Amino acid sequence: MIKALDEYVFREVCTHQRRWLDEGKKIVPISINLSRASLYFESVVKRYHDIARRIGIYTHLVPIEITESAAVDNDEIKSIADKFHGNGFPLLVDDFGSGYSSLVTLNMKCFDTLKIDKSLIDYIGDSMVRGCLCTR
């Protein structure tokens, strides 16, 4: 069911963007947060690419968000993330620093944006170590 919801949201975003373009409005990218369940199916990349193409939306207008834990946990998901990126979808890694932070994530070559979780910076000035990390 969650995969169907992910696809519904993706299709609705593409449809709205197409309508706004047709109305002459300036549009900005709207990112789609995909569930981990959707990322276990290699066909998801082709399916989403086909939806965007059929509706007439460039893939760079619908960035794909995945959580850091999903990106790091599984080589299969990393491969699918690479395929999204290779098909023109910007890739955002969400929740970086929410207890799962890893330099491995920073070595992922396919992501375009790293969204830092608020919990990583909440107390950044409260300790000398955190302050050093912030200023170096």
Give residue ranges: language-model regions:
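Catalytic core of bacterial c-di-GMP phosphodiesterases, primarily the EAL and HD-GYP domains
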Residues: I2-I77
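Short, solvent-exposed loop/turn segments at secondary-structure boundaries
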Residues: S43, G125-V129
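A generic structural signal for residues located within well-ordered alpha-helices
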Residues: L5, S98-S101, V129
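Alpha-helix-loop-beta-strand connector modules within alpha/beta enzyme cores
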Residues: L133-R136
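The catalytic core of metal-dependent phosphodiesterases that act on cyclic dinucleotides
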Residues: I51-I124
